[in-house]
């Protein structure tokens, strides 16, 4: 099992860029997901989870592997590293790196009278997480994140 304890690690610095810079997310084709429920929803939604970083004092390796399958790289991180990467104040001790995907509206299969949430260019990645949790709780059929610059 790989371990990273320094927030100065080049890999961790690249993840901070993913967290903070839309350009880094576009260039790498990846983004960060924070939280067990969010990782499960992304996995269920067909997102490819590449790596999971977790605090071993909060989660066991077995718990982490149950979230996104066994074909994922798992990295134990220190609390210092987690605090550097975490967006939310409340902590679950887990962050995933996932592949981005772009979907066309033509491929969206909706039933009759669908309930859709449309968000135009959310400023912070954490806002998207809140929108997704709200949409899930409200039983929405789709969430569309629109970027007027693309």
Residue ranges and their predicted role:
Residues 1-62, 149-150:
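Boundary-proximal intrinsically disordered activation/regulatory segments immediately upstream
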Residues 30, 50-52, 73-75, 92-96, ...:
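Structural motif
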Residues 35, 96, 135:
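Residue-level signal for inorganic ion chemistry
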Residues 44, 108-150:
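RNA substrate-binding interface of SAM-dependent RNA methyltransferases
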Residues 60-71:
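Short, aromatic/basic amphipathic alpha-helical patches
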Residues 69-87:
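A glycine-rich helix N-cap at a beta->alpha junction
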Residues 89, 93-113, 145:
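Acidic/glycine-rich phosphate/pyrophosphate-binding loops and surrounding catalytic core
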């Amino acid at each position: 099992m790989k371990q990273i304890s320094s927030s100065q690690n080049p890999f961790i610095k690249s993840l901070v860029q993913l967290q903070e810079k839309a350009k880094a997310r576009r260039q790498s084709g990846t983004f960060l997901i924070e939280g067990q429920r969010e990782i499960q929803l992304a996995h269920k939604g067909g997102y490819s989870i590449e790596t999971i970083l977790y605090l071993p004092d909060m989660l066991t390796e077995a718990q982490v592997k149950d979230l996104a399958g066994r074909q994922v790289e798992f990295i134990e991180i220190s609390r210092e590293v987690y605090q550097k990467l975490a967006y939310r104040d409340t902590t679950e001790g887990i962050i995933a790196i996932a592949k981005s995907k772009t979907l066309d509206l033509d491929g969206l299969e909706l039933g009759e009278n669908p309930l859709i949430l449309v968000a135009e260019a959310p400023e912070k990645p954490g806002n998207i997480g809140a929108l997704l949790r709200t949409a899930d709780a409200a039983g929405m059929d789709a969430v569309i994140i629109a970027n007027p610059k693309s």
